[in-house]
Regions:
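N-terminal secretory signal peptides
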Residues: 1-10, 14, 18-28
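Detector for C-terminal structural segments
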Residues: 379-426, 478, 482-492, 518-675
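Gly/Pro-rich hinge or "lid" segments in bacterial periplasmic/extracellular proteins
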Residues: 187-201, 207-211, 215-294, 655-675
Length: 675
């Protein structure tokens, strides 16, 4: 694709608006106020940005996002997807945030403490936080009452439709009962207010305007990590009353209220979002912000590379072909600028669909029978060699991307300092195996030989009428050649690992929304999706796959196992037994509240059971190579929550960072973590 890049006498932002880099202008949504290049410059003044190299920092910054990750909800209380949180985290603050080391730091809460047994947590709030509208005009003052309103909204089934209830109902006294009450009330629950929640005995109170107290069901020494999640964000009753429940639930950048570091200057759906500083941000004096931050939607990494070369982007991740182009030419200027990023705090997995439909809406019985078979699923975890596919994400060190666990590494540690996934590895029997750059760890025991499992699966499935090869339908966004290239490599991995007589990958496309076009009609055989923790405990991962829980995200929205449980077929009996056993193990682990080590050991057993039965098949960690004008190690790096894309205190440079500089950043970061 040829792109007519602009001359340097107009701004980069003007180019992006005019070029329509993803091919569709979408809907223009903007609020009032100046659109000049100086807009927000006064509000941006505050703390100096970090500068460890003496470089000239950037005042404006242009980042990117994949075209298939467009924001779908601007309401953090309602949304459960990271692609939404990555946007709205810049607009809406909660009790706490995080620093570049992943440590909890104050946001609207200035400090917090727990009682002796960690059942009562008290948060002390700032007295200088305001809601502003999309024009940056102050609308209301934020007090502890706004957090009561926010929690009532989340717990009210009529208002928030069961979204984001798992954290409060799991931990807060009376929260589950209040949620069930509103669920039973139906539409009438829409009339309830926060006082009704308090009267029902939910364990939250506001003794004064700037104090918030939570009472937990059981001792919870990590509750501060729970309270950092969006379930506990504030909301304004004034705005809810003004918009009405349905409009507030579906609010957008033009009618929402802001209390974060930025407001949206302009939003062109499917194209760009531009943010300017919130002129009334409470922490303006203590954080650095950009005068303008633009996020460009990118449908193709080849286009992204062209944009970066012309300084229409300030950072890009590099795919395999671009790295090959750079490294194959010793004179290429970018050879010295290749920067390996740290792993994003997400664990990606292959989420099987246990109730797949055909395009005409009829059940895909062949797939549904096959995926219900244990031996069939075990072939994915024990035999699918993904090294070539990992190379699409990390050409230089592909096996650094290998993920053998459902829970993300680094989420939590027991009292002996043992990282949780090492407990899972011990249960799985490969705790002694280390990264060698050559072979996937989970394939070493049998060399990836699944001939016996394959024979068993084909015999058992043939007996109930399954025909081979089984077609595994995998959807990618139609506009991305990079996604097609990735899928082509994945298809070859299937062929090499399974044989074309057993399982064949069928690559299909969707236009713009995976949710609306694929997941809702249940057309996929599997989706490869990442989960970032909401708080610092394994239940936040493992609880998403359990039965009998309205809040189990993947069970309801990806695997559809919750629907299968309503009326399982005979061939799904063993599958349901496995999910019931897994659910029991998770619930038993979750019930251990006074012994952290025993709790994590029990969760590790539950996770090992999940992996042995391959209810989900882990795939990769996102460890990319990049070209960048931002120091990745200066950005927020939280292991949980949705704050990592909050653009404050970023170290940037007019000149691109070099490989050597990034190695120095990594060493300094590791030393700070270990020290």
């Amino acid at each position: 694709m040829n792109i007519n890049f602009e001359s340097r006498n107009i701004t980069r932002r003007s180019f992006l608006k005019g070029a329509g880099v993803v091919g569709a202008a979408g809907l223009l949504s903007a609020c009032g106020g100046s659109k000049s290049n100086n807009s927000g410059s006064t509000a941006a003044s505050g703390a100096e940005a970090p500068n460890s190299t003496g470089a000239t920092p950037l005042k404006e910054y242009i980042s990117w996002e994949s075209a298939n990750r467009e924001v779908e909800s601007w309401n953090l209380l309602y949304s459960q997807t990271l692609s939404d949180a990555n946007v709205v985290t810049n607009l809406w603050d909660g009790l706490m945030s995080f620093d570049c080391y992943g440590k909890l730091v104050p946001a609207i809460a200035t400090s917090w403490e727990a009682n002796e047994d960690s059942t009562v947590w008290t948060f002390h709030l700032r007295d200088d936080v305001d809601w502003v509208d999309c024009n940056g005009e102050v609308k209301e003052h934020i007090t502890a009452t706004d957090f009561l309103v926010g929690l009532e909204w989340v717990l009210n089934a009529s208002k928030n439709e069961a979204n984001n209830t798992s954290m409060p109902t799991l931990y807060i006294v009376g929260a589950e009962e209040y949620y069930e009450k509103t669920k039973d009330m139906g539409a009438a629950a829409a009339d309830l207010r926060y006082q009704d929640m308090l009267d029902a005995g939910v364990g939250i109170e506001a003794p004064d305007d700037y104090t918030l107290v939570f009472t937990c069901k059981d001792p919870c020494p990590y509750f501060d990590t729970v309270a950092s999640y969006t379930s506990f964000y504030p909301a304004s009753q004034v705005l809810i009353d003004e918009l009405g429940i349905e409009t507030f639930r579906g609010c957008d950048n033009t009618n929402m209220w802001y209390c974060g570091p930025y407001i949206v200057e302009e939003y062109i759906q499917g194209n760009t979002k531009s943010y300017i500083p919130n002129p009334h941000y409470y922490d303006a004096a203590n954080v650095s912000r950009f005068e303008r931050l633009t996020v460009t939607m990118i449908s193709d990494q080849a286009i992204a590379f062209q944009l970066y070369q012309n300084r229409e982007l300030d950072e890009i991740d590099l795919n395999e072909s671009t790295i090959t182009t750079i490294t194959s030419d010793p004179n290429n200027e970018y050879n010295s600028q290749l920067c390996e990023k740290r792993a994003r705090p997400s664990a990606y997995a292959m989420h099987f669909n246990y109730q797949k439909n055909n395009a005409d809406g009829t059940p895909d019985v062949n797939w549904n029978k096959a995926i219900a078979n244990t031996a069939f699923r075990q072939c994915f975890y024990r035999g699918l060699d993904l090294k070539a596919w990992f190379s699409r994400y990390n050409k230089i060190n592909p096996l650094k991307c290998e993920n053998d666990y459902y829970t993300m590494k680094g989420l939590c540690y027991n009292t002996q300092g043992v990282e949780y996934t090492t407990l899972v590895a011990k249960e799985m029997g490969f705790d002694a195996e280390k990264y060698d750059g050559e072979t996937m760890i989970r394939l070493r025991a049998n060399g990836g030989d699944i001939s016996a499992l394959k024979k068993q699966a084909m015999e058992e499935l043939s007996a109930i009428g399954v025909t081979f090869p089984v077609k595994a339908t995998y959807f990618i966004i139609a506009s991305s050649t990079s996604a097609l290239d990735n899928a082509t490599i994945l298809k070859q991995c299937f062929s090499d690992s399974f044989g074309d007589d057993f399982i064949k990958l069928d690559v299909q496309t969707y236009v713009s929304s995976l949710t609306q076009e694929v997941r809702t009609p249940q057309l996929q055989s599997f989706v490869i999706n990442g989960w970032s923790a909401d708080f610092g405990d394994p239940v936040n991962f493992l609880g998403q796959e359990t039965l009998h829980d309205d809040n189990a995200f993947y069970s309801h929205y990806y695997s559809n196992i919750a629907r299968v449980a309503e009326a399982p077929a005979d061939y799904q009996k063993d599958l349901m037994d496995a999910f019931e056993q897994y659910t029991d193990l998770v619930n038993a682990a979750s019930a251990i509240v006074n012994d952290t080590d025993a709790r994590y050991e029990a969760f590790a057993k539950a996770e090992a059971y999940m992996l042995e039965n391959v209810l989900v098949s882990p795939t990769y960690y996102d460890i990319a190579w990049s070209l960048t004008h931002a120091n990745e190690y200066s950005k927020i790096n939280a292991m949980y929550g949705g704050c990592n894309y909050k653009a404050v205190n970023w170290e940037t440079s007019e000149e691109a960072y070099t490989t050597v500089q990034y190695e120095q950043f990594a060493k300094a970061f590791d030393a700070a973590i270990q020290g």
